Amino acid sequence: MPRRSSRRTGITWAEASDNVLTAARSRAAGGMNVYYIGYNMDMAIEYIEACALWARVFNAAVSEIEPGEELFEQDGDRVIKTYTIRFESGFRIVALSSRPANLRGKQGVVVIDEAAFHSDLDELLKAALALLIWGGRVHVISTHNGDQNPFNVLINDIRAGRRAGKVHRVDFREAVADGLYRRVCLRRRIDWTAEGETQWVADVYKFYGEAANEELDVSPSQGSGAWLSQSLIEARSID
């Protein structure tokens, strides 16, 4: 299930809430392990902290966050760290590094975050899709990183019926309509106004400039730097 999303719209935060509910359920109720894969350690920490927050909100019985040993590549350094939250259900949420071999022999839900920016997404997907055979799920979340990126190829293949799956799309304006700016106001402790929201949206688009098409409007750029319209994307997907 790929999700094409704009920058900073809360997709990972929302995914964490769903993942906590999944891991907190019993096996009979559909519970299973969740494996989160970001492309650096900071993403793993942010995600696990979001899961811990949601676990408290849902009053899910969990242990403390447990550090473990795994290799993350970050700025040329090899950092040994994973993070695990264990639930009373017996299931756990684990943040792993981006090595495809990490998923071998595992079962549950796989979340690949900012998939278009992983160095070996094709191999990572191969390893993740094996979990579907025994009833697992694979959630692939990302902003775009060009039209030739494996993430965009995956989306086009699903739209064309060459691969199974569902594609979800959340662009920046949709997120604003659903309350993104209201949440920003809450975090910044300022009052929401319609005029303020309009100006804020305009300012965000202005500082992204030409990159707003890809970063905010979920339209992948061509290799030449031009942008693909939504209608052209859909037309190409069924050629």
Report residues per predicted region.
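Walker A/P-loop
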Residues: 1-18
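Structural motif
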Residues: 2-4, 35-37, 109-113
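Walker A/P-loop NTP-binding motif
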Residues: 14-29
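Conserved nucleotide-state-sensing and coupling region of NTP-binding domains
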Residues: 29-96, 235
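Non-catalytic, compositionally simple segments
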Residues: 121-239
